[in-house]
């Protein structure tokens, strides 16, 4: 079977990687650029603070972010360099403290289903 994948961003590259593991599948990736960042998110994977009301979008974004760890582990097992990935923290800045509190509570509730969020804290000037 031949499969054509349009775009070598995170979704296209991941699909190509897993499909290419199947001997009966011949994968070709088409992309107009080489060595550039994704146009979707500039490499930032952090859907947990999104206030979008579309639950299907959030679920897809959350599961994708959670899956990233598995992808990196699979790549490493196959001897593929994974130095492109580094899990770091996120700083959110808000002019109004109540907005920051809202996001903090949102992240706390979402951390139950997605522990990858990690530690949460509100930093003050002190």
Feature map (PLM): residue ranges:
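Beta1/beta-strand and adjacent pyrophosphate-binding region of the FAD-binding site
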Residues: 1-11
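Conserved active-site and cofactor/substrate-binding residues in soluble primary-metabolism enzymes
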Residues: 5, 40, 63
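Short beta-strand/turn micro-motifs composed of small residues
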Residues: 7, 31, 94
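Glycine-rich FAD pyrophosphate-binding loop
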Residues: 20-41
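Dinucleotide-binding Rossmann-like beta1-alpha1 core, especially the glycine-rich loop
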Residues: 44-126
């Amino acid at each position: 079977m031949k499969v054509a994948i349009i775009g070598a961003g995170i979704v296209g590259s991941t699909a190509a990687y897993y499909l290419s593991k199947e001997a009966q599948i011949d994968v070709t990736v088409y992309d107009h650029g080489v060595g550039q960042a994704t146009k979707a998110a500039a490499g930032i994977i952090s859907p947990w603070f999104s206030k979008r009301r579309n639950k299907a979008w959030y679920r897809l974004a959350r599961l994708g972010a959670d899956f990233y760890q598995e992808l990196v582990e699979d790549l490493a097992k196959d001897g593929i360099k994974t130095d492109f990935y580094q899990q770091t923290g996120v700083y959110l800045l808000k002019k109004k403290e109540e907005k920051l509190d809202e996001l903090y509570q949102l992240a706390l509730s979402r951390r139950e289903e997605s522990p990858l969020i990690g530690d949460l804290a509100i930093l003050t000037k002190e």
